[in-house]
Structures are given as C-alpha cells and as structure tokens.
Amino acid sequence: LVDFVEYLNEGFEPLHDKIISFSDQTKDSEIEVALQWKNEDDVTVKSFANNIHTLEGGTHEEGLRTAVTKAINDFAKKRNLHSDISLTGDDIREGMTGVVSVRVKEPQFEGQTKTKLGNTEMKSKVQVLINEEFPKWLSKNTKEGRAIVERCAVAAKARMSAKKARELTKRKSILETSGLPGKLADCSSTDPTESELFIVEGDSAAGPAKQARDSRVQAILPIRGKIINVQKVT
C-alpha cells in the first residue's frame, strides 16, 4: 500500500516524506493501512476488501476515518497544539491520502453496485489497529505530527472563516430586505444576548462612534434629527 499511496501522490508536494503504514493479521482477517498528507486541499481515500475496490466505502473505511480523527485530536491535545481550535474530521482529512485494505473470510458486500463492505466487525478492527499504532508513530515522529496538526489547523481556520463570511452575507441580505436603514454599521456577532445597538445623531457622530466601538458586539445606527430623551418626555 505504501507504493500505491506514493503513486496516488505523484505530482503533489508531500507534507511529510515518510508514508505512514500499519498492518495486522489474525486467523479471521488481514488489515493494511497507509497514510500521507500533502499540501493540497483534496482528500483521497481508497478502500479494498479481498482485492475488490470498494468504491462505496464501507465499515473498514469508516473505521479509518474515525480512528485517524481521534489520533490527530489526541496528539494535538497532548502537545497543547491549537487548543483554541476544535478539529473536525473534515479538517483532519483535508490533504490526506489514505488507503485501507482488508481480507475477510466471509465478506458482505452491500450497495447498488455491491462495492460497499458491510462486515460490522471490520470497523472496530481497523479502529483498534490505528488507535494502537498511529499514536506510537506520532510520538516517534513529532516533527511530522506537528506539521500534520498545523495543516489541519489551517483547514479549520479556513472553514470557520468561510462560515463567518456566509453568516455575514446572510445577515446583510436579511438587513437589506427588512427595510432597516442602509447606514447601519452592523456587528459581527450573531448572539443577541451580547450584541448592542447604539443610535447616534447624524453621520458626524457615527464616524467617531464606529472608531471607538467593539465591532464584534456593538452596532452603530446614525439617524437624522434630534434624538428624543424619552425619560424627560415621559
């Protein structure tokens, strides 16, 4: 599988030179796993069962995804790397090329094309192998492990930035269609419990207010005319 991963990553810049590989063999099954991260955004995961390419994935592929996510998160937590960021499975798999191949005595193939492995025990077997061996590899290759975590953190930050941009765009379109004044300098927070709206008199007052505000939680709305002191009026 190491040669296969090397072939799949031809033309790409690897994040680490060493291709990670594990294997295990029992009387009932055989498991091989190979992993390598690259400086690209795409994800490549290939899985095989009894030399059949399981195009629709299956339990062995689920075990690979789950265990890799756990191992990287555990390593990052142990080394106190980017503790302020929660790495998702998608963050961790970005740039990853992973291959898992299993052999089972009685394979159960599912799906429309019968290319999905359904043997439930293979998920836990693949997980056990990776959960045992991958942390050992990361401990022995801390430089490569840190590089992988850094790569995952970049993916996480990009995901969060994209989410924030979508929320701001959505919020802006809601404000534009709700009839609210166009001069509203909105805040970035979407939590109403911490957000504040300051109404000021005219554009001249709005300028200094915008400069002095906390743009994360404070919005500024300039309006025309004198603002009535409601307390005095009542």
Place the predicted regions along the sequence by residue.
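GHKL-family ATPase ATP-binding module
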Residues: 1-234
